[in-house]
Each structure stands twice: as C-alpha cells, then as structure tokens.
Design a protein with these regions (language model features):
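Metal-dependent DNA phosphodiester-chemistry modules and their immediately adjacent helices/loops
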Residues: 173-203, 207
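Acidic/histidine-rich catalytic cores and adjacent linkers
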Residues: 36, 40, 195-335
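Short, charged amphipathic recognition helices of the HTH superfamily
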Residues: 24-36
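Residue-level signature of catalytic and energy-coupling elements of molecular machines
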Residues: 30, 84, 105, 141, ...
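RNase H-like nuclease fold core
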Residues: 1-7, 12-16, 36-142, 147, ...
Length: 335
C-alpha cells in the first residue's frame, strides 16, 4: 500500500481531490473519506484542509476543461453531431456530442450561454472546426428549434442535414396546453413519431394540429413549426434501433445526468466558469462510461442516406436541412 507521503505530491493530491469530489464527497468531508494511512495523515493535515482540497479540485477541473477544449478532433470520422443546452444552477452551457462511424460517442466541447445566442453557438462550432473536426462531409445535426443554433450550423457545416429533437418538440407543444390535455396530446405525438414512415407520421401530426388549431392555436402552430425536420431520421429510413438515439438529444441529457450526479453537493453555482469546469469534468468522466450507440452497424447506411439527401437537395438548388419534400407528400396522403 502506498504511504501517505506518496500522495503528497501536487499532481497526485490533485488527482485524488478530483476523484473524491466527483464521487460527491464534499470539501468538509474530504479528509474523512480518505483511507486511513497512519499518523502521517495528522502530520500532513494541511494537505486535506477544506481550502486546500478546493484549490486542488479547481486546478484539476481547469485541466479537464482545457483537455476537453484542446483535444485534436481531426481523427474523428463524424456522422452525427448532437447539440443541446444544459443548466447548472442559473448558468447554461451549450454542449456538443459527436457520434463517429464506429458507433462511439465523443464529448467534443462546450460553451457558456444559450442555444438562442448566435455568438455562443457559432463560437463553439468554429472551435470544433479549428480543432480539426471535418465539417465538409454530410452530417446529421440533432438540435432543438433555436434559430440561432440552426443559423450557426448552416454557417459552419458545409452539408448539414438537420434533425429537430422530438423530445423538445413534445415539450414545446405541451407548454401551450392545459396539463391533462397536454399529456394526451403528447402521447399522440409520440405515437405519430413511432410510425414506420415519415409520410404517415407527418400526415398524423398534421391531423393532430388540425384538431388543436381552433381551441389551442399556439399548440397547433408549435407542432407545425419545423415539423418536417422532426422527421428527418424517418425520412432517411434509418434503422429503428439507431433512430432511437438520433431523433432526439437525449444522449446529451444522459451524459449530463452524470455531470449533475457528480455535482449533487454543489449548492452555489457562483460563476459560469465554475459551471464550465464541472460540466467539462463530468463530460470527460462520462466518456469512460459510454457504450457504442444502439444500432451502430447501421451507421454506414445512414452515411449513404445523408450523401443521397445532400445530392438530391443540391439538384433542387436547396439546402438539405429543409426536408420540404415530405410535407407535400404528407398533405397528399392526408387528403
């Protein structure tokens, strides 16, 4: 067993502080959480004081943030990019998660701010590009409905194919409805999203919107807004096992739940910088727990579908992200 002196070096104490704090041990309880190692603990008690541990944890999380935001991305064969906003207290971080052709998930970066802030989201995407991320290939971009985010994606990526998050869409529609009705409508919308084709799903969603438009025009308008983009994965005929991962930003929410779990003892998010450090440390920690996405063997088929989508859009002289063809077909099916 290593002696306590072996842990007195700044690097190892810093690593130990990060490990214990990420395991939800508070600075006050940190010392009691160490394994007993003899009288040397008492002699070196200054190394485990609340302020000393806090300083080491700050340095360790600063290193995790620098590691995350400085990683070389040039070797990633990205097929999908998920972007979402994550709350830490009153602070919001925009988080980017990539899926590569081998099915692995990669935390790519983050920025403090909202998906509604064009400067923030474009800055994050430009940072990914400057670190070597290939933005020239057709890529599935899974996002919420923030216009600033959509605009930034179009500016930075050469051939983005946008999938609007279905979970965000359901929440937005529910926010326009009384609680009881909201739950009923949400169930119907989710059932529509599970239909086997974009054609049938869009026809069903339009029928739901039509039922709502007189009594609840806000909900109807919310459902119709960006409807085709909520069905991009269905239109691309992505295998159902893979589609479950790519039709929403839930993979980011799962990752950030790990961040939140590690930060459960934090009661005062004093700054955006603190939120960035904790979030980055959690993202790096989460990477070690990731499994391949379900249905990853179908990623080559997704890439071919993305390439075909981009080629078809180029032939029509329109961006691939619009997904407009499905809307007219669905209307005909409904008629």
């Amino acid at each position: 067993m290593p002696t306590y002196e072996a842990f007195s070096s700044a690097e190892l104490l810093q690593s130990l502080a990060l490990e214990k704090m990420m395991a939800k041990l508070s600075t006050r309880r940190y010392r009691s959480g160490l394994q007993p190692m003899g009288q040397e603990v008492e002699a070196a008690s200054a190394s485990t004081s609340k302020s000393a541990v806090s300083r080491r944890f700050v340095r360790a999380t600063e290193e995790r943030l620098a590691e995350l935001m400085g990683a070389d991305l040039s070797g990633l064969d990205l097929v999908a990019l998920l972007i979402d906003g994550v709350h830490f207290g009153e602070h919001l971080c925009v988080v980017a998660l990539g899926v590569t052709m081998d099915g692995k998930k990669h935390p790519l970066g983050l920025a403090e701010g909202s998906t509604e802030n064009s400067t923030v989201v474009k800055g994050l995407l430009v940072n990914l590009r400057e670190r070597g991320l290939d933005v020239t290939k057709p890529t599935l971009i899974v996002i919420d409905g923030a216009k600033a985010l959509s605009s930034a994606v179009l500016e930075v990526f050469d051939h983005p194919v946008v999938q609007r998050c279905q979970v965000h869409k359901v929440r937005n529609v529910k926010s326009h409805l009384p609680e009881g009705l909201g739950n009923t409508v949400a169930s119907k919308v989710r059932a529509a999203y599970r239909l086997p084709s974009a054609l049938s799903a869009e026809a069903k969603l339009e029928a739901i919107a039509k039922d709502l438009e007189r009594a609840h025009p806000g909900a109807a308008g919310s459902l119709r807004e960006g409807m085709a983009e909520t069905l991009t994965v269905a239109r691309l005929d992505v295998h159902p096992s893979l589609a479950r991962c790519l039709r929403s930003t839930n993979s980011i929410e799962s990752m950030t739940e790990i961040c939140r779990d590690h930060s459960a003892n934090v009661t005062n998010w004093s700054s955006g910088e603190m939120a960035l450090r904790w979030c980055a440390a959690g993202m790096v920690e989460a990477k070690g727990q990731f499994r391949r996405v379900d249905g990853y063997l179908h990623l080559p088929a997704l890439r071919r579908a993305l390439e075909a989508e981009v080629a078809a859009a180029a032939g029509k002289g329109s961006p691939a992200r619009t997904g407009g063809a499905g809307a007219s077909e669905a209307a005909q099916a409904a008629a």
